[in-house]
Amino acid sequence: MDDEKIISQGIMQKHLRDLLKDPPNLLKNFHYEDVLAFLELGEQIHFFKGDTILSDDEYVNAAYLIAEGKVSVWKENIQLATLDKKEFLGETFLFSRNNRTERIACEEDCILLKYERYEALNYFRKRPEKLFNIFTKNIIEIQQNKISSMNSQLFALMK
């Protein structure tokens, strides 16, 4: 499907165009067509400020891309992180089923793209193996950055 056809159908919304121009880190080094196909795979879900997206210890088989807005991650009453546009929640969802989550809440009105595990796996099965290897490498880099950030925060707390 080309851009003109998508735009003429009214499917290509501003947040999707923005994500195509500057893809999230999880899709880094994907070709334009692969980024577009992956974005189209996601189910758009709208949330409002204060909404709970996922509850504590909920089991999920999906990941969420923040297309617009900002969310916070909570464990009990402690805010663990704030995530912005272009960040993923649960990016390791392809590697295990029924992942448990922390509470995810909207800090402002949001549009999330929800990716079901089964559909995402089928997406990669239909493409060259190299694309899944790039995706896996991106996940590892994201996880390394999260660990480094947590280490820095822990170190700051211990001072």
Residue ranges with predicted function:
Residues 1-159:
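Cytosolic regulatory regions built on CNB/CRP/Popeye-like sensor folds
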